[in-house]
């Protein structure tokens, strides 16, 4: 294992200027006797001076970056200075094609490019072209702790039963759709709600009340919309009790409760690098409904014509057109019905894959029509695959992949 030194960023970090030793706590967490883990608190994402200070004091063997490269333009501007001493490794993700040539200077500045999604690995290679010959490319998908997100036996967990009563009051819903993400436009929450409304309309009247959609998100956001107004317009007249919002900050244990309350997790984001809530749901043994875009494709385990887990390449860079239809039993994919090009000055172009809410409603009905035992069986197969050697979407395997890189 590695010794670890990290810039610990916050908007205005209260411990800026200190050096924090969390070696003992980390050692207990991962059962290592000689852990060495230090934090250098910084405002924002740091600057040139803190990097030079850390390099002089700690003498690291490499620098590893995570997140959008534009947060580290100052570091990439000093890449020649850094790479005289040590290599730069970048754990990166990109939501969609076209391959972003505007990221080329950032990718060129790295020695190791670790793509969180298979699509990102392909994008890194496309953007670099011949300049990637001396680079190392590695698939390093997200990894979570399977001891935090796991299936719960309701009969043996009073805390879970009490939490369920808190959410549903005196009701015991027959079918629960769960959404967990930020209230921002690309998450397509209004489309998700309209799809649920159409699903309710398709049911016999006596079955509608027992179906709920539970959303753990912000009720109102300038980056998204007023979800209570959406609920009122589409549900108030006939379905005022079918939409439930979870608005409080929750512990990881409570989040796991929510995943276990659900019969299916939904995420139809139009641009999604990975979709961590899908991974969390799968670890909890819950099936998923997802838009076929970005890293969500990895989690649905599409199978190519050779019977292998689909890997994007120059011929089939994405499965958003439905080239491959076979997938994991835990997944209920929704193929995009439209594609547009969006952008901003820093990121001038990127595809925006949008699915029809009518298609999402059909996936709700497909999951609803399954026997509850079949739904659970499929969800547990998802957890089994997440923890398999092939997928390895758990924290220990992610760490091993980083070290292999």
What are these regions (language model features)?
Residues 119, 143:
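Carbohydrate-associated surface elements
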Residues 165, 170-187, 193-196:
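Conserved donor-binding/catalytic core segment of Leloir-type glycosyltransferases
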Residues 270:
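Aromatic "clamp/platform" in nucleotide-sugar-dependent glycosyltransferases that forms part
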Residues 40, 52-72, 87-89:
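Short N-terminal targeting/anchoring amphipathic segment
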Residues 1-49, 53, 221:
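N-terminal strand-loop element at the rim of the active site
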Residues 224-253:
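Nucleotide-activated donor-binding/catalytic signature segment of Leloir-type glycosyltransferases, i.e.
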Residues 351-359, 372-404:
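A charged, aromatic-enriched C-terminal amphipathic alpha-helix characteristic of glycosyltransferases
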